[in-house]
Regions:
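Flexible "cap/lid" loop of the alpha/beta hydrolase fold
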Residues: 98-139
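Active-site glycine-rich loops that stabilize anionic/oxyanionic intermediates
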Residues: 26-31, 94
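Conserved acidic catalytic loop of the alpha/beta-hydrolase fold
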Residues: 72-88
């Protein structure tokens, strides 16, 4: 197994594996237990015979921040966490979906499920300095987006400096999806009331053979709801 600095929780089925491992990638300012373990994903996947890997992204949860927090650098670190496998399925949500987009370049990805994905770079307009000033005891930023990010990075248990560094790295490689960038079977999933993934349907024509399912809920509700998990499991268990 390749060494990695990331905290990774691994789950195994009771019997022989029925398919490749599944890598679950959480959203910004969250962690693996919050997004995946508490919502029952490892239990559902191992019951279907699948090994599961649940990392904390760099600077999130129990994982230290990386010096380089660009999407490509994080993808390389995630590939190291997975190690040498012949195939892997990936489910990403929000930031996790953004990073999952990069993984077929560095991992033998068999299938992708991308949930809650913004078709645009979501951090481009964030005033990182203002968010950090709030974290240091200053005023809440007037800009609504920056204020929302400021609240996220100062939530209990979060590391504001590490999360701000993550934002800065992501902005150095803005999300600019192009036709043909993904060639693996892909399912997009979006909450019906999720403003973050508004416009996600524009990504479907860029990925040959992909589809889009809409499930109930806003950005957080869609992640926690059973319909998203059901849609992902159905796609991942397709031969």
């Amino acid at each position: 197994m390749t060494l990695t600095s990331l905290a990774v929780r691994r789950f195994a089925p009771d019997g022989p594996p029925a398919g490749p491992p599944v890598l679950l990638l959480h959203g910004f300012a969250s962690d693996g237990p919050t997004d995946w373990i508490s919502t029952g994903w490892p239990s559902a996947l191992t019951a279907a015979g699948r090994p599961v890997l649940v990392p904390d992204l760099p600077g999130h949860g129990s994982s230290p921040a990386l010096a380089d927090t660009t999407p490509k650098a994080i993808a390389e670190e995630l590939a190291a966490a997975v190690g040498h496998v012949s195939d892997v399925d990936v489910v990403g949500y929000s930031l996790g979906a953004r990073l999952a987009w990069e993984l077929p370049a560095v991992l033998p990805v068999r299938r992708l499920v991308l949930g809650g994905l913004s078709p645009h770079e979501p951090f481009g307009a964030v005033d990182v300095e203002a968010a950090l000033a709030f974290a240091a005891g200053g005023r809440l930023p007037a800009d609504p987006l920056t204020a929302a990010i400021a609240r996220m990075i100062t939530a209990p248990g979060r590391d504001p400096a590490a999360l701000a560094r993550c934002i800065e790295g992501l902005r150095r490689e803005p999300f600019a999806p192009e036709a043909g960038a993904l060639t693996v079977p892909t399912r997009f999933v979006a909450g019906r009331d999720d403003p973050v993934s508004q416009g996600i349907e524009t990504l479907v024509p860029l990925v040959p053979g992909s589809d889009l399912l809409t499930v109930p809920g806003d950005h957080g509700g869609a992640l926690r709801g059973a319909p998203f998990r059901t849609a992902a499991l159905a796609f991942l268990t397709t031969p």
